[in-house]
UniProtKB/Swiss-Prot annotation:
Binds 1 divalent metal cation per subunit. This is 5'-nucleotidase SurE. A divalent metal cation binds at D8, D9, S39, N91. Keywords: Cytoplasm, Hydrolase, Metal-binding, Nucleotide-binding. Belongs to the SurE nucleotidase family. It catalyses: a ribonucleoside 5'-phosphate + H2O = a ribonucleoside + phosphate. Its cofactor is a divalent metal cation. It comes from Polaromonas sp. (strain JS666 / ATCC BAA-500). Its main location: cytoplasm. Its EC number is 3.1.3.5. SUPFAM superfamilies: SurE-like. Transmembrane segments: none annotated. NCBIfam families: PRK00346.1-3 (NF001489), PRK00346.1-4 (NF001490), surE (TIGR00087).
Length: 261
């Protein structure tokens, strides 16, 4: 099995190194990742400046672009083959609830999904790499569980669920404190904290985006709740942003506008 690994923290981050070391035991693994930290770049693609691919001493390839750029370039020419799985991470910090909209980690996995390849975004819920070895081992265990279905896809017999996109958050805890795995829906956060302003040495006002807001929908069944109870959370995602519940309302509103003319 062939796996493409990306991330948004950059090719030198501890999370992607640990993930590579864990997955190379069970698959042929290739790393194509951003040169620099690209957190919160979502699905952004670079369209107005050139990008370059370089190779690090450990064989990782890195690009002066976004996480989605890296996956896009890898899949459209750099690799020369189609991987069976795209994996992104392990991110330094959670990607739960509304985080998934902004996350470069999720954006990289989503790019793989958009190309019809099963994809997984892995994140560790608390910043810092205290238990990154645990997170990497848990990530490998999940991939191993999914291998039979991935092999079916590779042989050309597409199961009904393929492709799929999973968002996985792993508690930053010792292995014996993790309670298991729960499939959960996305929770929600309050709006981001107030923008931070500072004055530059030249007297100019500088602005920094405030921190993520606290959880506001974090009840049972959400990713926030699962990880708070020391479970690994797994959330299946898709890219359909249609508000299906309100479609009938807007159809009626459009009909009234049509009648008015």
């Amino acid at each position: 099995m062939k796996i493409l690994i990306c991330n948004d923290d950059g090719y030198q981050a501890s999370g992607i190194i640990a993930l590579y070391e864990a997955l190379k035991i069970v698959a042929d693994v290739e790393v194509v990742a951003p040169e620099q930290n690209n957190s919160a770049k979502s699905n952004a693609l670079t369209l107005h400046s050139p990008m370059y691919v370089q190779t690090a001493a450990n064989g990782f390839r890195y690009i002066n672009g976004t996480p989605a750029d890296c996956v896009h370039i890898a899949l459209t020419g750099l690799l020369g083959y189609r991987p069976d799985l795209v994996v992104s991470g392990i991110n330094n910090g959670a990607n739960m609830g509304d985080d998934t909209i902004y996350s470069g980690t999720v954006g990289a996995a989503m790019e793989g999904y958009l190309f019809g390849i099963p994809s997984i975004a892995f994140s560790q819920t608390e910043k810092g790499w205290a238990h990154i070895d645990v997170a990497a081992r848990r990530a490998r265990e999940l991939v191993e569980q999914l291998m039979p279905s991935l092999e079916v896809v590779a042989e050309g017999a597409q199961p009904a669920l393929a492709p799929w996109l999973l968002n996985v958050n792993i508690p930053n805890l010792p292995d014996d404190q993790i309670q298991g795995v729960k499939v959960a829906r996305l929770g929600r956060r309050h709006a981001a904290e107030r923008v931070i302003t500072q004055t530059s040495p030249r007297g100019e006002t500088m602005y920094w985006i405030g921190g993520a807001g606290p959880a506001k929908e974090a009840g049972e069944g959400t990713d926030f709740y699962a990880t708070s109870q020391k479970f690994v959370s797994i959330t299946p995602l898709h890219v359909d942003l249609t508000d299906h519940e309100r479609l009938p309302y807007w159809e009626q509103a459009a009909a009234r506008l049509t009648q008015a003319h």
